[in-house]
């Protein structure tokens, strides 16, 4: 009469119950069955963000250094009509000149050095007048203050040599001399300087040689001067007058008699003195 509850439940009809299932997987490519239309606000925001990104990309300095890709070849500069492209023949002379340039520079550097050495060696050989002229030009002597710069290179260092004191005395005397001709009152000081030069031939040998050559030339000029005057006389009358003047000078210097007086030979004078007084009276 009473059935068990378990059997009653099993035999009882079960109503259709929907099975609860989880959410199915959905891919990006798959779309839902129903899509909602976007609002105008959402579209406006999207357009504003896109335009802002483009503006920032074009105006910002972050992307300024990025190279731009271009498929067009770069335009090459056009050569002028008067200029031609370099050739092998035109390049060879330039390469040779570039090779010769270092040698020429070395020669040019050696030439001033040799010139300076020659100038230093020739500086002691200059006369006092030349030294004074160079001193005026190179500011060794200041006429306004009356001071002499003994360190001037134009003096050749002679103011500090073994005969430096004598050279200073002679040079300063010549510079300050007011006699005519200039330097006549400084002869003694120049002689003292030359004596000092002779005492040091190892230092002033070149100066002594120049002095001897100058003296020899002066003596030769003095001896040859009458001969040159005789040669220059083109008229026989002038030659005769010059010869007569020379003869008169020689006679006056030797104390001889003039041409108007009688000239007695020496042998005749001796023979007359040997004669006896009787022979002289007979004559």
Curated annotation (Swiss-Prot):
S-S pairs: 152-154, 163-196, 173-186
GO molecular function, one term: protein-disulfide reductase activity
Membrane side Mitochondrial intermembrane: residue ranges: 65-283
Entry's cofactor comment: Cu(2+) or Zn(2+).
Topological type in the membrane: Single-pass type II membrane protein
Motif mapping: Cx9C motif 2: 186-196
Region feature Disordered, mapped onto this chain: 72-136, 211-283
Keyword Transit peptide included in the entry's annotation: yes
Mitochondrial matrix membrane side: 36-46
Reported cofactor(s): Cu(2+); Zn(2+)
Main location: mitochondrion
Domain of life: Eukaryota
Annotated organelle transit peptide span: 1-35
Motif segment (Cx9C motif 1): 163-173
GO cellular component, one term: mitochondrial intermembrane space
Localization (cell): Mitochondrion inner membrane
Positions with biased composition (Low complexity): 102-119
GO annotation, biological process: protein import into mitochondrial intermembrane space
TM helices/strands, residue ranges: 47-64
Quaternary structure and partners: Monomer.
Domain notes: The CHCH domain contains a conserved twin Cys-X(9)-Cys motif which is required for import and stability of MIA40 in mitochondria.
Protein name as annotated: Mitochondrial intermembrane space import and assembly protein 40
Organism the protein comes from: Emericella nidulans (strain FGSC A4 / ATCC 38163 / CBS 112.46 / NRRL 194 / M139)
Lineage, top ranks: Eukaryota, Fungi, Dikarya, Ascomycota, Pezizomycotina
């Amino acid at each position: 009469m009473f059935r068990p509850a378990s059997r009653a439940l099993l035999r009882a009809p079960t109503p259709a119950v929907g099975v609860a299932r989880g959410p199915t997987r959905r891919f990006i490519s798959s779309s839902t069955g129903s899509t909602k239309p976007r609002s105008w606000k959402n579209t406006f925001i999207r357009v504003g963000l896109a335009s802002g990104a483009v503006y920032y990309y074009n105006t910002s300095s972050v992307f300024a250094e990025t190279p731009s890709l271009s498929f067009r070849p770069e335009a090459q500069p056009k050569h002028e009509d008067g200029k031609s492209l370099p050739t092998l023949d035109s390049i060879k002379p330039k390469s040779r000149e570039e090779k010769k340039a270092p040698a020429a520079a070395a020669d040019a550097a050696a030439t001033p050095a040799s010139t300076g050495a020659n100038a230093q060696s020739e500086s002691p050989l200059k006369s006092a007048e030349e030294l004074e002229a160079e001193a005026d030009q190179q500011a060794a002597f200041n006429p306004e203050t009356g001071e002499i710069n003994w360190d001037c290179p134009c003096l050749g260092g002679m103011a500090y040599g073994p005969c430096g004191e004598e050279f200073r005395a002679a040079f300063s005397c010549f510079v300050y001399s007011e006699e005519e001709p200039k330097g006549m009152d400084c002869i003694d000081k120049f002689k003292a300087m030359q004596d000092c030069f002779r005492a040091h031939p190892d230092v002033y040998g070149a100066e002594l040689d120049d002095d001897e050559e100058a003296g020899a030339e002066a003596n030769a000029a003095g001896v040859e001067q009458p001969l040159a005057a005789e040669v220059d006389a083109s008229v026989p009358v002038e030659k005769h007058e010059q010869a007569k003047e020379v003869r008169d000078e020689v006679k006056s210097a030797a104390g001889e008699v003039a041409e108007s007086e009688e000239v007695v030979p020496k042998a005749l004078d001796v023979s007359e003195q040997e004669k006896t007084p009787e022979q002289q009276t007979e004559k």
